[in-house]
């Protein structure tokens, strides 16, 4: 009986150690993806600040804005989300025209705001896993001129296993840019 109890304890300890190792290993992967999301946002912000500091408003800035969209966003997913049910009912031709027009508007808006970006700085606050497929990266945008108050910004990052992270939405002071 004593020998049987000892075997049960040993088996239980092995199970607990295996579970603990499993939690540590998955916790590490979890932390890596949240860290990866935070680094992605910091890289994006640094890239925008570099462009804003060095580029005059010219045709090159439109290409750089377009490149940023390609690197950090899943453009077609975002574009389709902005018009909701109309996307599902649109023909292929209508979708392609919308994608082209929407992209032109987004690139134009981004390119025209680079001068304003020169006076902004981003300060990382936190990154956290939300649900199964989302990471939220929070930070503060500070206007160095003092013209505007600091604003809380949250980046909603899509985290699908086996795929690259990408920005799905951006909220300022809890107001979603995608939903407004």
Model-predicted regions and their roles:
Residues 3-16:
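Bacterial N-terminal signal peptides that target proteins for export
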Residues 14-24:
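Bacterial N-terminal signal peptides
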Residues 27-31:
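Sec/Tat signal peptide C-region and signal peptidase I cleavage site
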Residues 33-112:
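Early exported N-terminus immediately downstream of N-terminal targeting peptides
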Residues 75, 89, 119, 174, ...:
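Generic structural "secondary-structure junction" signal
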Residues 87, 104-105, 143-144, 172-177:
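Solvent-exposed loop/turn segments at secondary-structure junctions
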Residues 108-151:
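Surface-exposed, charged secondary-structure patches
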Residues 150-179:
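Short beta-strand edge/turn micro-motifs at domain boundaries
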């Amino acid at each position: 009986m004593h020998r049987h109890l000892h075997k049960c304890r040993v088996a239980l300890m092995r199970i607990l150690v295996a579970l603990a190792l499993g939690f540590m290993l998955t916790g590490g992967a979890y932390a890596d993806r949240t860290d990866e999301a935070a680094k992605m946002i910091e890289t994006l912000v640094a890239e925008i600040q570099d462009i804003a500091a060095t580029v005059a408003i010219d045709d090159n800035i439109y290409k750089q804005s377009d490149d940023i969209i390609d690197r950090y966003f899943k453009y077609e997913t975002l574009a389709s989300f902005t018009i909701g049910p109309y996307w599902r009912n649109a023909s292929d031709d209508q979708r392609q025209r919308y994608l082209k027009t929407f992209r032109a508007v987004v690139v134009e808006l981004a390119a025209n705001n680079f001068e304003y970006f020169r006076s902004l700085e981003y300060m990382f606050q936190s990154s956290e896993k939300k649900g199964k497929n989302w990471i939220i990266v929070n930070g503060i945008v500070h206007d160095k001129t003092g013209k505007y108050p600091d604003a809380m910004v949250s980046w909603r990052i899509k985290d699908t296993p086996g795929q690259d992270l990408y920005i799905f939405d951006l909220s300022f002071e809890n107001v979603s840019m995608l939903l407004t």
